């Protein structure tokens, strides 16, 4: 009897794993770059501590190698702290693709590590999105007197979408 129950459990687990693998679609979004305008508001600026809030609005160029997000827009707001030359921060980003479907995520910066990105939620084809990865700033202009600047960032990693 125990062997039959064990065999049934193994069969059920195998079928469940097979269904889960078929029920999800994973995509590698490496090669994605978004460029836009950032506005920084400094709260504290000193030799040992700088704290600022920032807001970024940008777009993924149509020639992006990651086709699902060509012409997508992104809006992020965040908090950053530089203490003894080390960056710490957190931000939330809202993405809208060319069809109007959206997804949201958050980024976390910790000292001496690449920035980490996690998908939180989505609408339309992104409903149930999960996954994450890292990101880096790939181009940055000089900051203007008003705290604004242009920059590009490139996330790398994978997302999983339910089928």
What is each residue range found by the language model?
Residues 1-8:
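Bacterial N-terminal signal peptides that target proteins for export
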Residues 8-16:
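Bacterial N-terminal signal peptides
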Residues 22-163:
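Beta-strand-enriched cores of mature, soluble protein domains
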